[in-house]
Regions:
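Short, basic/aromatic recognition patches
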Residues: 1-19
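Structured helix-beta-strand junction loops
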Residues: 14-15, 60-61, 138
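Short, surface-exposed beta-strand-loop junctions and turns on beta-sheet-rich folds
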Residues: 51-53, 149-150
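Active-site-adjacent structural patch at catalytic or cofactor/ligand-binding sites
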Residues: 61-71, 81-90
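Amphipathic alpha-helical interface surfaces
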Residues: 8, 54, 99-103
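Short acidic (Asp/Glu) patches
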Residues: 48-52, 67-72, 110-121
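Short beta-strand segments
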Residues: 15-50, 56, 66-70, 77-80
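Charged, gly/pro-rich active-site loop segments
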Residues: 77-161
Length: 161
């Protein structure tokens, strides 16, 4: 088991889409559909460096939320739980050409077609200039069996660096 409760880890490993929420300059939440990638400790997202206001929003306020609510958005069996992870995000942009590549194996595992696109990356060079978003989970809410008719099971995470 990694840093998160097992049901949350299962959802993060299998979900193809999540709702990633940042706070805009006015303090209002702004939500983006994103592919969640999980390495057993941190949650990773990635974003093009072009036209990405979400990166500026994270730098201004690192408090974020990642919700996975679409039980059918997987390659295999439907998800059995809905999950929201609240935490702190950091934008890692040391080198937009290579820094994000450390999550490439996770991305390919989730979306095998990415391997084919990556092989043809010279055709879309600006698409592959990416920033890495690293989320340190602080709190996890789990709705067992996906039912929102009951309150979620809440896990406050301690000892997560």
């Amino acid at each position: 088991m990694g840093a998160l409760p097992e049901p949350a880890e299962d959802v993060l490993r299998r979900a193809l889409v999540s709702e990633f929420t940042v706070l805009g300059p006015s303090g209002r939440p702004i939500t983006h559909p994103m592919i969640p990638l999980y390495d057993g400790e941190r949650i990773y997202l990635h974003s093009s460096i072009l036209f990405s206001k979400k990166l500026a929003h994270i730098k201004a306020n690192p408090k974020v939320s990642l919700a996975i609510t679409d039980l059918g958005a997987t390659h295999g069996e439907p998800l059995t739980h809905r999950v929201t992870v609240q935490g702190d995000a950091a934008v890692i942009e040391d080198d937009p050409h290579t820094t994000w590549q450390r999550i490439l194996p996770l991305w390919i595992e989730k979306e095998p077609i990415v391997k084919e696109f990556y092989a043809k990356r010279v055709a879309l060079p600006l698409f592959w200039e990416r920033s890495l978003i690293e989320i340190t989970p602080r709190r996890v809410l789990i709705w067992p069996e996906g039912s929102t008719e009951r309150p979620p099971v809440v896990h406050e995470l301690t000892g997560v660096a």
